């Protein structure tokens, strides 16, 4: 009696020839028996007829999966068409409402979009549920594997999109549809204009915030600003869509108006502060008279407080000897006794009102400017302090007179003396010559002489000092005005031109 199946290895019941096998599998089919005879083992071997049955089952499962996916896609398309119709209906009705109702419509539109997004998620989850529950067989669990064979009898796999990736793709498609449907609307609708209506919060449900909080709306005093705000408060959402270009122009005009007003106010404040500073520093009660200028005008403050450009501008006012060997020469200038002594002279000029425009009633503003300009431009030949001290000494002299001495009464006159000559206009020859010693800019030594000439009280004005710089050369003429007599003599000064006066730099600051 011949052998009968089934095969102990593959399980088939029909075969052309039954063959012998190993003791654990005594009966084998033709294919398995041939494998045993040639190879001597049946490990990892599956005959072709067994593989064909498995492929048929796989094809059946694959057909069921594709069927469920197609049903899910059809449901998705139907829901997307419904959602698009709802959105178009809302967009058509939206411009009819006013601004208050427009906000509510925007919230409704947002809720609709949220519902559509959630609906797409639900539909996607439903499709996934259909995909997983289409077939109850155990082999259906392979649908959730990460790889699916792309060809028969191959081990090469390709990645399968997960449910999260599918949901992301659906949301991206929905976003593109919304953007394409809103192309007809102007881009100005994204700009939320300021409104005076009371609102619970500045956030209005769009994820946007108003440009200015309506609760903190500042009442402006300018009539132009109030008129612009009233125009904006009365405008509706339909006006915003139909006249968006005009609204942008109004906003631009208002921005330029506020910008111009701010710049003008800053310039006015800066000019006013500078003018007030000049009046305060040049008045009789200037704080420069009561402080120690050595703590302000020194080398350290010059380096710290001024920029490089400002330092260069101030260095141009110095003589060449003080600007050759920097910074050593500059430090020596600040620490020199002559520079420190001139502080008291400068404070004396301020206290007597030389730089006070309001106190000098007889002097014009042009004369003050000329006085300062001449003191700065030719400070090497400046005789400001000497001339000022001489005038003050003439005022303080006993009997309002100036004592002169003859040339022979002063023995051993040094070379750098100041020669003072007086000449009468109605006489041809010189009656008398006088000399006075000026050892420093602080004081003038007067010598008693044999005769005195009477002199009226001289009026000290910036014009009298400005006349010093009007003449070129080594001598200058001082003129006296006001109560001065017409037959006043001319006072001629012959001063050396090699002296530098740092107080000219201080005048520049005023």
From Swiss-Prot:
Coiled coil: none annotated. One of its GO terms (molecular function) is sequence-specific DNA binding. The keyword DNA-binding applies. It is found in: Nucleus. The keyword NAD does not apply. One of its GO terms (biological process) is regulation of DNA-templated transcription. Its main location: nucleus. PROSITE patterns: DEUBAD, GATA_ZN_FINGER_1, GATA_ZN_FINGER_2. CDD domains: ZnF_GATA. GO terms for cellular component: nucleus. This is GATA transcription factor 26.
């Amino acid at each position: 009696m011949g052998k009968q199946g089934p095969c102990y290895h593959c399980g088939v019941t029909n075969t052309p020839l039954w063959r012998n096998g190993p003791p654990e599998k005594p009966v084998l089919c033709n294919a398995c028996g041939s494998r045993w005879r040639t190879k001597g083992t049946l490990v990892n071997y599956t005959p072709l007829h067994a593989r064909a049955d498995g492929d048929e089952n796989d094809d059946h499962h694959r057909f069921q999966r594709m069927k469920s996916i197609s049903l899910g896609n059809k449901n998705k398309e139907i829901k997307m068409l419904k959602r698009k119709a709802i959105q178009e209906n809302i967009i058509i009705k939206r411009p009819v409402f006013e601004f208050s109702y427009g906000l509510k419509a925007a919230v409704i539109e947002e809720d609709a979009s949220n519902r559509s997004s959630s609906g797409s998620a639900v539909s996607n989850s439903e499709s996934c549920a259909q995909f997983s529950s289409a077939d109850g067989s155990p082999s259906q669990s392979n649908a959730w594997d990460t790889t699916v064979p792309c060809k028969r009898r191959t081990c090469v796999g390709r990645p399968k999109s997960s449910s999260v990736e599918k949901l992301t793709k659906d949301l991206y498609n929905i976003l593109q549809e919304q953007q394409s449907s809103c192309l007809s609307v102007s881009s100005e609708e994204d700009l939320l204009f300021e409104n005076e209506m009371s609102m619970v919060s500045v956030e209005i449900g769009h994820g946007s915030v108003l440009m200015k909080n309506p609760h903190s709306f500042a009442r402006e005093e300018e009539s132009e600003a109030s008129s612009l705000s009233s125009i904006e408060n009365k405008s509706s959402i339909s006006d915003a869509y139909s006249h968006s270009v005009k609204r942008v122009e109004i906003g631009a005009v208002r921005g330029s108006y506020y910008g111009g007003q701010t710049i003008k106010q800053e310039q006015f404040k800066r000019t006013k502060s500078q003018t007030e500073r000049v009046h305060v520093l040049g008045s009789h009660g200037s704080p420069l008279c009561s402080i120690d200028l050595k703590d302000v005008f020194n080398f350290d403050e010059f380096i710290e407080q001024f920029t490089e450009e400002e330092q260069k501008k101030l260095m141009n006012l110095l003589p060449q000897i003080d600007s050759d060997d920097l910074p050593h020469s500059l430090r020596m200038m600040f620490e020199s006794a002559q520079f420190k002594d001139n502080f008291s002279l400068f404070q004396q000029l301020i206290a007597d009102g030389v730089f006070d425009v309001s106190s000098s009633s007889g002097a014009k503003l042009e004369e003050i400017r000329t006085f300062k300009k001449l003191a700065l431009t030719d400070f090497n030949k400046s005789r400001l302090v000497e001339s000022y001290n001489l005038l003050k000494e003439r005022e303080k002299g006993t009997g309002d007179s100036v004592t002169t001495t003859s040339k022979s009464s002063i023995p051993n006159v040094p070379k750098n003396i100041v020669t003072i000559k007086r000449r009468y206009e109605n006489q041809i020859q010189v009656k008398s010559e006088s000399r006075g010693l000026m050892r420093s800019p602080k004081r003038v030594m007067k010598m008693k002489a044999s005769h005195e000439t009477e002199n009226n009280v001289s009026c000290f004005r910036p014009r009298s000092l400005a006349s010093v710089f009007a003449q070129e050369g080594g001598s200058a003429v001082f003129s006296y005005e006001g109560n001065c007599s017409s037959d006043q003599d001319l006072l001629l000064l012959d001063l050396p031109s090699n002296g530098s006066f740092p107080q000219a730099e201080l005048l520049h600051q005023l």
